[in-house]
Regions:
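Internal, well-ordered domain-core segments that constitute the primary functional module
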Residues: 127-206
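Rossmann-fold NAD(P)-binding glycine/threonine-rich loop
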Residues: 88-159
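Long, compositionally biased stretches enriched for glycine and/or charged residues
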Residues: 183-496
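Short acidic low-complexity segments
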Residues: 61-74
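NAD(P)-binding Rossmann-fold cofactor-contacting core
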Residues: 26-52
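Gly/Ser/Thr-rich loops at beta-strand to alpha-helix junctions
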Residues: 8-13, 39-41, 86, 144-152, ...
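N-terminal Rossmann-like dinucleotide-binding module
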Residues: 3-32
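Hydrophobic or amphipathic alpha-helical targeting/insertion segments
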Residues: 74-82
């Protein structure tokens, strides 16, 4: 059996997820393939992971290749952790909208950054899915960790014709936070979540069968750390009655209220940790983390290798799903799948995040029923944008792309329509190398920008670093505190629990 990783150069995540898989005795003789477009990152992650494998006494030899089809050939599972455009495109996702007053913390799920990320991803996943269909195992399952998770998963299932499950750790992180607030161990709190990726709602929170949702808001407010760092999530629960899975910074981007006035952003965020709302926080951490890893890599090779043990596995779903499908050991988690009636008051064709069970028979999704109306309405505001963005990406349809931007909750709150049109043109121009489906529209966008500058209708950019921007440290600055630099770099690791 073969498992292929695409975007394997996502070093911390690939290494941790591989350890999760190879900690399962029945999976210790699988074939492993890594592929990436960055040869240096691919080489570094291969060195680290092969050393881990060897130190655990396994005979696996990683196939490390720049040839995607070679990696996919015969694979029963493909795990995606790609970032199309890498940090160069990510920087544009944050900086261009900021010139129009759109202040993002993460920018990888919705808002202007998430919409553009989907345009790049879908252009690339068109080829990925084609390769999977042509050379992978006929029953290959794509486990997608790439953001924007919902839109990529929507495309791959519906248009790429590859069975795909989107995976995220937001549910697990919020579960930990809820247990902490209520004064219990996480294992003693039973939760059910339903919604859409990064806006999933804890619709059931129980301890020994007792519903504790009525206690949760007061418990969250009473915890000094949570009250300081999760102001948006607490305020959303006050208005909608249920706690949301995603972090303060993430959630602040998916609704129109918390980031539209730059002078008020500090009221709702905390700068202690990037994910609590810092302007461009995830970009800063990813940039510092990449630069630090490239500098500090020789020291990583001197550290003890990972031990492949059950008790050291992470909370990520990927390894558990493969284990359940291959061994029959039942796994319960929350997964991103085509709705198909699971949540009855969201569209059947959208991607929802809901409970699921996995065993040798496959992945089974129970019927959740209706979400509370207010929660469903919040989700629908995002689903409508996702639908427009996915369809825009299919053929490079600028009309649908503009409409996605117009209807995005934060973009629409921060900008007038003319500014949104101009911002969209600038994003297309600056990200042209990753958007082949927009080639003709990009030339038209250039002409519109030139005409606007010539006739005086060009909207001048806002000169700002954002309402809550922190300095991106140089390698030299990070070297002054190596331990802090390493810890900060790990904040960009998808496998790290952030609560």
């Amino acid at each position: 059996m073969k498992i292929a990783f695409i975007g394997a150069g996502s070093i911390g995540f690939t290494r941790r997820l591989l350890a999760d898989i190879l900690s399962v005795k029945e999976l210790q003789n699988v074939e492993i393939a890594f592929t990436d477009i960055n040869p240096r990152n691919l080489d570094m992650v291969t060195q680290l992971c092969q050393r881990d494998i060897d130190s655990n006494g396994l005979s696996i030899k990683i196939l490390s290749t720049l040839d995607r089809r070679e990696a996919f050939r015969g694979a029963k599972y493909v795990i995606s952790c790609v970032r199309i455009g890498m940090l160069e495109a990510f920087t544009k996702d944050i900086e261009v909208p900021l010139r129009y007053g759109v202040d993002q913390c993460v920018g990888d799920t919705l808002c202007a950054g998430g919409i553009m990320y989907a345009q790049r991803d879908i252009a690339a996943f068109r080829d990925f899915c084609k390769d999977i269909r042509e050379v992978a195992d006929p029953n290959c399952l794509l486990l997608n960790y790439s953001n924007p998770c919902a839109m990529v998963t929507w495309y791959c299932n519906t248009y790429g014709k590859v069975k795909t499950v989107g995976l995220c750790h937001g549910v697990q992180g919020g579960h930990h936070l809820i247990a902490k607030a209520l004064g219990y161990e996480q294992k003693d709190i039973d939760i059910i979540c339903a919604g859409i990726n990064h806006m999933t709602w804890y619709i059931s929170v129980k301890h020994n069968g007792e519903d504790l949702n009525y206690k949760l808001l007061d418990a969250l407010k009473a915890d000094p750390d949570i009250a300081r760092t999760e102001k948006v999530r607490i305020d959303m629960m006050k208005h909608f009655g249920y706690f949301s899975t995603e972090s303060n910074g993430h959630l602040s981007e998916y609704v129109p209220w918390y980031r539209k006035h730059t002078e008020n952003i500090h009221k709702y965020i905390d700068l202690g940790v990037w994910i609590n709302g810092e302007t461009g926080g995830y970009l800063r951490v990813c940039t510092e983390g990449r630069n630090w890893f490239e500098t500090d890599f020789p020291n990583w090779l001197k550290e003890p290798p990972y031990e492949y043990k059950e008790e050291k596995r992470s909370g990520e779903h990927g390894g558990r799903i493969i284990e359940a499908l291959e061994t029959g050991r039942v796994y319960r988690g929350h997964f991103n799948v085509i709705n198909d009636g699971a949540i009855t008051n969201l569209p059947d064709d959208c991607v929802v995040e809901v409970p699921g069970y996995v065993d040798k028979n496959g992945i089974s999704i129970p019927k959740v029923g209706d979400l509370p109306l207010g929660c469903a309405a919040c989700c629908m505001s995002n689903v409508s944008v996702q639908r427009l963005a996915v369809h825009a990406a299919l053929e490079g349809d600028i009309t649908l792309l503009r409409q996605a931007m117009l209807l995005d909750p934060l973009v629409g709150a921060a900008c007038e329509p003319d500014a949104i049109y101009q911002m969209t043109d600038e994003l297309l121009i600056e990200e042209a190398e990753w958007l082949p489906q927009y080639a003709q529209e990009i030339e038209r966008a250039k002409a519109r920008i030139e005409k606007a500058k010539a006739d005086g209708t060009f909207i001048p950019p806002i000169v700002t670093q954002g309402a809550a921007r922190l300095h991106t440290k140089t390698v030299e600055e990070m070297m002054l505190d190596r331990e802090a630099a390493k810890n900060n770099a790990q904040e960009a690791d998808k496998a790290k629990k952030r609560t």
